[in-house]
């Protein structure tokens, strides 16, 4: 898929991996719509890159439909979606205070997996109505996690949600093949994000020690670089790519 002059949506686009991806797409000439719950941060970045900002909860069908319509009105046919929105929470299934609350588990699944599916189904439907751009109509990139493969203690809900995203990619790609819509996922390891930047130095050193090479947190720009490579390579479809410096998470 050509990036220049293509309309793109980036969810979770106001910070972290989403913001880096939005900047990278805009730098290559894409017309970017930032979807985020943080209206002020999204608006500031939209002004910086010449895009638009739409306040959006990715689990809300009405909000996502509105965002797709806003993008189409401002930028034309939607071709690229990079879904970065999600939450990271920790909690043991059975902790000192008893079993994890069922609604706490369901909330993580609802936001991370349900939100991904909601954005996927609605944007894919919009893309399916378009005329092809070359040999394809669009591409959707989800954000999984290495926790999908090696969930640590306290990550049961998060790992289950991200594992669901990994499992969603292939059947979705097979289903959308008739439309010429690709579906991919990136599974990042430890990255420089607002959450990670709040960790104390000793905790950072402990995490970095688990990464073979490069022995550091990934940079959001490196996530964005892979996202753009996926967009431009039509043979990449139905797969989750780990982006982790050969990291394999230990049990804790």
Predicted regions and their residues:
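Conserved mid-core segment of classical short-chain dehydrogenase/reductases
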Residues: 88-106, 125, 129-134, 154-157, ...
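Short, small/polar-rich loop/turn modules that mediate ligand/substrate recognition or access, typified
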Residues: 177, 182, 236-239
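Residue(s) in the substrate-gating loop at a strand-loop-helix junction
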Residues: 145
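The beta1-alpha1 cofactor-binding region of Rossmann-like NAD(H)/NADP(H)-dependent oxidoreductases
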Residues: 39, 56-67, 102
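Active-site helix of classical SDR
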Residues: 120, 161, 169
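C-terminal substrate-recognition "lid" of short-chain dehydrogenase/reductases
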Residues: 131, 219-243, 248
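Canonical Rossmann dinucleotide-binding motif of NAD(H)/NADP(H)-dependent dehydrogenases/reductases
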Residues: 2-33
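Catalytic Tyr-X3-Lys loop
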Residues: 87, 98-118, 140-141, 165
